């Protein structure tokens, strides 16, 4: 599975940000003179070091929609706390609309076990060992946003200890 072909179109930029197109959809708007065609692009931007964002762009051509999507994704960046094994600190659920995503940390070497837009978001965030399951809706955009919702809820051990007002040693089981 390590040699699996990357999903979507990928561009590597010189400043370390990678963008991947998840979905290109041709949409129409009915106006007085007929139907007006445009394109809606869902894409994910990430630096594979703990920052990731999902953006949507609409324009009359695909290239313009991608540019708008990149700026939208960079406006909605999320920072992900990664562990030493490039996983997440604890299991979490993310919800967006009717889409629900379960994210669970996994053992080193297991890889990203997820599908669709969930996989793309997790890979570009820098997570390398994780189990993810989509529940409810199969909507691409809502599943990507559900992952972001889950990733924003993650807390490290030090943050949890600080919130509870106890030393970090008390959080570890004896």
Swiss-Prot record:
GO terms for cellular component: chloroplast; small ribosomal subunit. It is found in: Plastid, Chloroplast. SUPFAM superfamilies: dsRNA-binding domain-like (SSF54768), Ribosomal protein S5 domain 2-like (SSF54211). One of its GO terms (molecular function) is structural constituent of ribosome. Its main location: plastid. Keywords: Chloroplast, Plastid, Ribonucleoprotein, Ribosomal protein, RNA-binding, rRNA-binding. Pfam families: Ribosomal_S5, Ribosomal_S5_C. Coiled coil: none annotated. Belongs to the universal ribosomal protein uS5 family. Part of the 30S ribosomal subunit. Contacts protein S4. This is Small ribosomal subunit protein uS5c. It comes from Porphyra purpurea. The gene is rps5.
